[in-house]
């Protein structure tokens, strides 16, 4: 394990081959050396990186947000968490089938690649997306606000949190989407807390706002807090159950 975060490092020397965890976040790094083959977790967020070296095949967690990345290398087939928000990315490489959490907000995407069937969290807000790919049945959290979406694809039945305000959405295409949204609203009186934003359905929005206090939602369940809850915790069940 190598922890060298929160210094003023501008470069890293050659790395030991047996490293499995590297945390070099909160530095002034412009590049990274070749990564060890056995590396599983790489935290390199809050640097000045413009690119990443080839990723090891065993990598499961990649937190590279708040950099100046313009592209990502081929992703490991074992990758479960990818947090690349707030970069200068215009495309994503093919996403691995094991990916569970994808956070790619605040980039310049006009589209996303096909999503993993295991994906449970998708945060793609503040991009230039005109459509979303197929959303698979395991998806539970969806943040796609502040894009250019005109419609929503079919929503998974397990979806518990959805936020899609600030999009030019004209209609919810399928009746199944309406049913799912109704179920989400119904669950507001249960133990789960939900953050749900609607701009194009005023009556529904006002009804929702009467059920739970708007300040509480915005303060505690705004998408920006999702990063804090998840970026260092790969066990999504623990995180979600703590809400």
PLM feature spans:
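Leucine-rich repeat
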Residues: 15-20, 35-40, 57-60, 76-80, ...
């Amino acid at each position: 394990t190598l922890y060298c975060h929160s210094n003023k490092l501008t470069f890293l020397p050659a790395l030991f081959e047996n490293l499995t965890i590297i945390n070099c976040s909160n530095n002034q790094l412009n590049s990274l050396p070749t990564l060890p083959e056995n590396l599983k977790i790489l935290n390199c967020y809050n640097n000045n990186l413009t690119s990443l070296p080839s990723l090891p095949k065993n990598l499961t967690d990649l937190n590279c947000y708040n950099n100046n990345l313009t592209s990502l290398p081929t992703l490991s087939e074992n990758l479960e968490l990818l947090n690349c928000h707030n970069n200068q990315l215009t495309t994503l490489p093919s996403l691995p089938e094991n990916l569970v959490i994808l956070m790619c907000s605040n980039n310049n995407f006009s589209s996303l690649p096909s999503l993993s069937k295991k994906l449970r969290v998708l945060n793609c807000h503040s991009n230039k997306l005109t459509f979303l790919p197929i959303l698979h049945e395991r998806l539970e959290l969806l943040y796609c606000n502040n894009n250019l979406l005109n419609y929503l694809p079919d929503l998974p039945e397990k979806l518990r949190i959805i936020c899609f305000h600030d999009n030019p959405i004209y209609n919810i295409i399928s009746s199944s989407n309406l049913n799912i949204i109704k179920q989400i609203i119904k669950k507001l009186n249960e133990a789960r807390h939900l953050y749900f934003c609607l701009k194009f359905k005023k009556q529904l929005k006002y009804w929702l706002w009467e059920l739970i206090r708007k300040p509480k939602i915005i303060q505690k369940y705004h998408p920006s807090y999702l990063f804090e809850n998840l970026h260092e915790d790969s066990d999504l069940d623990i995180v979600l159950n703590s809400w």
